[in-house]
Structure formats: structure tokens, C-alpha cells
């Protein structure tokens, strides 16, 4: 009898793992966490998730040398929509990427999307292999 009670719990145990390893969620792993260009960038901190699975999201950083943050958002949508990935903007700012000096400065806010959590952005950049040796400063 105990075995039957244990078997009833099996769907509750397996379901979270099934969601984590479904093909829709695996596509999130294929999205690079950081894409910024050299020089001064406008950047956005973005929470991405597969439609219907908002609980299993991932935070990414995207930046480009463009006139406004809306242009960065448009490029994000062009990248993610074909994959069926939704994006929620957490905020924006500016990044000065001095690759030759191995320095990055994160500062400012976006007029369109509000300010991003620059400390969180710094942590994401430091976790990325390209920028782990960089000196990253945050100015609010």
C-alpha cells in the first residue's frame, strides 16, 4: 500500500524536471547572456522567458552604439521573436566598454525604460568569460 501512495507522488516530482528540460526552455540556454559592442553603448537589462513559462526566465544584457534604447529593444525582438522567446525590459543605462584597457563603466538611465540595476548588470558581465578579467565600475 505504501508503494501505491509513493507512486501517486511521482507526477509531482517529475513535473518540474520535465518543464526544466523541455525543448522550449532549452532554447533560452542558447541565447548568449551578454552582447555589447566596444566603445559607448546604450544597454538594456532584459528578462527573457518562453511564452507560458514566466517562472523559468533568464536575465540578459544587450547593448549597442545607437541613438536610443528603443533601437536596442528592436534588435532584441528581432533576435528573440523567431525563437518564440518573450522579453521584459528591467531597465537600461549606458556602458562604456574600453576593451583595450580591460575596463567597463556602467552608468546612467534610460528615458524610455527607466534605470537598470547596474550592480546586477556588473555581476552578469563578470560571470561572462569575455569580461571576467575586466575592471567593472558602477556609477548610479
UniProtKB/Swiss-Prot annotation:
One MF annotation (Gene Ontology) recorded for this entry:
protein histidine phosphatase activity
What the entry lists under InterPro entries is as follows: Janus (IPR007702), Janus_sf (IPR038596)
Specify the domain of life of the species encoding this protein.
Eukaryota
Q: Which residues hold substrate? A: 42, 110-112
GO biological process terms, semicolon-separated: cell differentiation; sex differentiation
Provide the Gene Ontology terms for cellular component: cytosol
- The active site of this protein is located at 69 (proton acceptor)
The record's section on Gene3D superfamilies has:
Janus/Ocnus
Effect of changing residue 70 to M: reported as: In strain: ZBMEL145 and ZBMEL186
Keywords (alphabetical) are: Differentiation, Sexual differentiation
The tissues where this chain's protein is expressed are given as: Germline cells of adult males.
Q: What does this protein do?
A: JanA and janB regulate somatic sex differentiation.
Task: Family membership, please give it.
Answer: Belongs to the janus family.
Q: What is this protein called?
A: Sex-regulated protein janus-B
Q: Which gene does this sequence derive from?
A: janB
Amino acid at each position: 500500500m505504501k508503494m501505491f501512495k509513493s507512486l501517486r507522488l511521482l507526477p509531482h516530482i517529475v513535473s518540474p524536471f520535465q518543464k526544466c528540460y523541455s525543448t522550449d526552455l532549452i532554447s533560452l540556454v542558447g541565447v548568449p547572456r551578454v552582447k555589447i559592442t566596444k566603445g559607448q553603448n546604450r544597454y538594456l537589462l532584459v528578462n527573457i522567458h518562453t511564452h507560458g513559462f514566466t517562472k523559468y526566465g533568464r536575465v540578459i544584457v544587450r547593448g549597442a552604439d545607437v541613438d536610443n534604447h528603443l533601437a536596442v529593444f528592436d534588435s532584441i525582438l528581432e533576435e528573440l521573436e523567431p525563437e518564440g522567446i518573450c522579453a521584459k525590459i528591467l531597465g537600461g543605462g549606458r556602458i562604456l566598454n574600453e576593451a583595450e584597457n580591460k575596463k567597463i563603466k556602467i552608468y546612467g538611465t534610460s528615458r524610455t525604460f527607466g534605470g537598470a540595476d547596474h550592480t546586477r548588470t556588473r555581476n552578469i558581465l563578470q560571470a561572462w568569460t569575455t569580461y571576467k578579467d575586466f575592471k567593472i565600475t558602477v556609477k548610479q
